[in-house]
Amino acid sequence: IFNFEGGCYAKVIDLTEEKEPDIYRAIRPGALLENVVFKKGTKEVDYFDSSITQNTRVSYPIDHIDNIQVPSYASNPKHIFFLTCDAFGVLPPVSKLTPGQAAYHFISGYTAKVAGTEAGITEPVPSFSACFGEPFMPLHPAVYAEMLSKKMREAGVSVWLVNTGWSGGPYGVGSRIKLKYTRAMISAILEGKLDDVDYETHPIFGLFMPKYCPGVPTELLDPMNTWLQKGAYVSKAIQLAHSFHINFDKFASQASEEIMKGGPLIDSHHSLNEHI
């Protein structure tokens, strides 16, 4: 069981059955498509046509996919996955978080806006939404973060940051991390195959990156290894780290020391050469 939803609202631009089999097969009577275009003279949807917008979507009920949990409840989770789409190519595809890091990244709620997600967006823009859902959180985000850390410890839950965004460079230079690799990482975690592997620490974000994951190219696991120019990677990583710091300033007064230590390791006085 991954999460509980009443259905799904998914992007369908460039959709193929090979890339997204569950979503593709869920598009049948009862599903609602938005902003899509039919192939001329047919009732067949052209998922590669973005003439109206890149933001083509489908809504479908939960029973349009297999492997659902009915009714929607379960015991404590063993793993929590924070999903982010880092369009700057900086964050690792998967990293294990300490309770402090989990709280920090939960409060930050980082992702990136890319072309096609909103009108006027042509370059990647960092986007932060506290607790990954700021409009729906009436209390200070630190309250929810402390609750998360407490429950993590009580239930022995592991928290992972999974980046489904870019590798080898930012949007427009690098490439999107393949879905099959993300699925391989999730499967490895659920099967306990990342419990005993060696980890290394990201020099700027302090994240714990596995050195090995079955089904995933080793060089992909450390994002710096996928960039042709290491200095360019470090520069972009420091830039993103500063965006995290600037965003977190408004929460710092109510965040514990443990949470504050869960953020990027660098500050504004660190030089580029220290990390190359």
Language model: regions and residue ranges:
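Generic structural signal for alpha-helix starts
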Residues: 178, 217, 254-259, 267
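N-terminal leader/transition segments
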Residues: 192-196, 200, 257-258, 262-269
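C-terminal, well-folded lobe of enzymatic/effector domains
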Residues: 230, 237-260
